[in-house]
């Protein structure tokens, strides 16, 4: 079985994330969306809230599961669940520069490969941080987030 991990904080999930997860589901038998919980970071949504929003959004995608990932190494999480690959979306060259050293270390530690999927052009400018900022200032982000996330941002889970 070919299992891949799509890791991230997903705070919040946006349509760029969903598009990468859906493409990964077409490439692998199973995709685990690993929701990170780094105690050094401050999140808008709890892990449980993020998981619920992701599950509501990807429920129609065959072979996709959502799991929390603790503060440990991603490579170790992959080893524990038997993942063959890590899937990362890339919005541009800066993302690759950031991701490449981590991919090399993950491969060194456990042999897990990182597969990069270029972002859909509609979402190359979208990030979770930008979504939170624009929404917080009263901007309309409905075009960029799934319905479950928009409800969460508007105060109703």
From Swiss-Prot:
Cofactors required: Mg(2+)
GO cellular component, one term: cytoplasm
Localization in the cell: Cytoplasm
GO molecular function terms noted in the UniProt entry: ATP binding; pantetheine-phosphate adenylyltransferase activity
Biological or metabolic pathway of the protein: Cofactor biosynthesis; coenzyme A biosynthesis; CoA from (R)-pantothenate: step 4/5
Keyword ATP-binding: yes
Transferase among keywords: yes
Catalytic activity: (R)-4'-phosphopantetheine + ATP + H(+) = 3'-dephospho-CoA + diphosphate
Alphabetical list of InterPro entries matching this protein: Cyt_trans-like, PPAT, Rossmann-like_a/b/a_fold
Binding of ATP, residues: 9-10, 17, 89-91, 99, 123-129
Gene Ontology BP annotations: coenzyme A biosynthetic process
Alphabetical UniProt keywords: ATP-binding, Coenzyme A biosynthesis, Cytoplasm, Magnesium, Nucleotide-binding, Nucleotidyltransferase, Transferase
Site (Transition state stabilizer): 17
Annotated positions binding substrate: 9, 41, 74, 88
Primary location: cytoplasm
EC numbers: 2.7.7.3
Subunit-structure text: Homohexamer.
Biological function: Reversibly transfers an adenylyl group from ATP to 4'-phosphopantetheine, yielding dephospho-CoA (dPCoA) and pyrophosphate.
Family listed: Belongs to the bacterial CoaD family.
Protein name: Phosphopantetheine adenylyltransferase
Organism field: Micrococcus luteus (strain ATCC 4698 / DSM 20030 / JCM 1464 / CCM 169 / CCUG 5858 / IAM 1056 / NBRC 3333 / NCIMB 9278 / NCTC 2665 / VKM Ac-2230)
Record gene name: coaD
């Amino acid at each position: 079985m070919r299992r891949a991990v799509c890791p991230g904080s997903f705070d919040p999930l946006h349509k760029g994330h969903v598009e990468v997860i859906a493409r990964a589901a077409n490439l692998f038998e199973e995709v685990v969306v690993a929701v990170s919980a780094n105690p050094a970071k401050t999140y808008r949504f709890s892990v449980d809230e993020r998981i619920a929003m992701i599950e509501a959004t990807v429920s129609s995608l065959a072979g996709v599961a959502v799991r929390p990932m603790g503060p440990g190494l991603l490579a170790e999480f992959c080893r524990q669940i038997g993942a063959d690959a890590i899937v990362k979306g890339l919005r541009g060259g800066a993302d690759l520069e950031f991701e490449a050293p981590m991919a090399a270390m993950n491969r060194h530690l456990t042999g897990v490969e990182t597969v990069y999927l270029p972002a859909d052009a509609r979402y190359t400018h979208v990030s979770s941080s930008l979504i939170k900022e624009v929404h917080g200032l009263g901007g309309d982000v409905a075009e960029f987030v799934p319905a479950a996330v928009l409800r969460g941002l508007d105060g109703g889970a």
